[in-house]
A protein has these predicted regions:
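Short beta-strand-centered segments that line the small-molecule binding cleft or hinge
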Residues: 49
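N-terminal secretory/targeting leader peptides
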Residues: 3-4, 8-46, 54-280
């Protein structure tokens, strides 16, 4: 569990941690919606939902049951769709594919016939190198390359359909949080708000240079076939709705996000240039 260190340590040697809440899925079914939603919000949309659309309040209500206080404390944009040892040309290439995948995205691609496993970051390179897995998703290009994925998997696919945003949270033992002074709480919250901004800015700034130099390490940046993306989105809708039917908290978070996005769409559809503006 991503925030387990705060609720399992009876001696209170660990009272806080920094984590991706999607790792809590086994205990808190709604946590992936707080961490990364396939075909979901973009980073600024998530931030707006968290700060002004009820996201903070509903997340706190989920975690108070486990005596944890979560604070939004980091944000990056899309991950890559993954690193593959072979090209992905069609839906058939996904069937039987052995891939490391986390969160709701793993459930979705498994529906298309992939064999999904969840490995810690430190074990992925060796699994790819030895052929135990054929592909992996993990993070951003700069992170993935530092872990050596570009040495053993030469096809890096986009877009990051499974994780168009990645939020990170500071999780604090609830009793510890309550014991802090108002000023200390304000300092922590202010620091995390600054971290969200700087984290996103830095992540956006450094990925392009990594991709631009892919040819020097024999890596090809590729786009997933459009028909595969459409099928992934279709299955994503099914998986998310099924999870909402199974779990009331999941349904509540999903409803909150949908309500926010429905109102936000009035602004988004009018205020921003279309992504394909230059092609119109």
């Amino acid at each position: 569990m991503g925030s387990e260190m705060c609720i399992r340590d009876r001696d209170r040697k660990v009272v806080a941690g920094y984590t991706w809440l999607g790792y809590d899925q086994g205990k808190i079914a709604a946590s992936p919606l707080i961490a990364a939603v396939p075909f979901g919000m973009e980073p600024w949309e998530y931030s707006a939902w968290w700060y002004n659309g009820g996201g903070r309040e509903i997340t706190e209500s989920l975690y108070v049951k486990y005596e944890i206080h979560p604070i939004f404390c980091g944000m990056t944009g899309p991950e890559t769709a993954g690193w593959f040892r072979e090209r992905i040309n069609s839906l058939d290439d996904v069937k039987g594919l052995k891939i490391r995948f986390a969160g709701l995205g793993g459930q979705i691609i498994e529906r298309l016939g992939a064999s999904v496993t969840m490995l810690p970051g430190g074990e992925i390179f060796q699994a790819l190198e030895k052929g135990a897995i054929d592909a992996t998703e993990f993070a951003l290009p700069i992170v993935d390359q530092a872990l050596g994925f570009s040495d053993v998997a030469k096809y890096n696919y986009y877009p990051g359909w499974h994780q168009p945003f990645t939020s990170s949270h500071l999780v604090i033992n609830l009793d510890t949080w309550k014991s802090l002074t108002r000023s200390d709480k304000a300092i922590i919250e202010m620091g995390c708000t600054a971290a969200v901004t700087r984290n996103l800015a830095h992540a956006e700034a450094v990925q392009g240079e990594i991709i631009a130099n892919f040819d020097q390490v024999g890596v090809s940046a590729e786009r997933l076939p459009l028909n595969l993306l459409k099928e992934l989105k279709k299955v994503a809708t099914q998986v998310i709705e099924e999870e909402a039917q199974r779990d009331a908290d999941f349904a509540a978070v999903l409803a909150s996000q949908k309500k926010f996005l429905a109102n936000y769409e009035y602004w988004k559809s009018l205020a921003y240039l279309p992504r394909n503006f230059d092609e119109l």
